[in-house]
Amino acid sequence: MPPSFFKKRLSPIKPGDPIDYKDTDLLKKFITERGKLLPRRMTGLTARQQRDLTNSVKRARIVALLPFVNPEG
């Protein structure tokens, strides 16, 4: 079997660190320019972190910290 050419990605958020909906700079790293969430295979997050991220982004949108859609896009 040939060696794997793919590197194992490290999660950009350390396991156990809370994902806060008020930290918009962190949340914007995981959102496209059109306002959609990036998938796990692109972000390198665990399933639990992706779930927490999704809930945080939704909460930030509801309290108007993040837009639902990008007005230019």
Curated annotation (Swiss-Prot):
Cellular compartments per GO CC: cytosolic small ribosomal subunit
PROSITE patterns according to UniProt: RIBOSOMAL_S18 (PS00057)
A GO BP entry: translation
Keyword Ribonucleoprotein: yes
Positions of disulphide bridges: none
Pfam families: Ribosomal_S18
Function text: Binds as a heterodimer with protein bS6 to the central domain of the 16S rRNA, where it helps stabilize the platform of the 30S subunit.
Designated name of the protein: Small ribosomal subunit protein bS18
Organism name: Synechococcus sp. (strain RCC307)
Top-level taxonomy: Bacteria, Bacillati, Cyanobacteriota, Cyanophyceae, Synechococcales
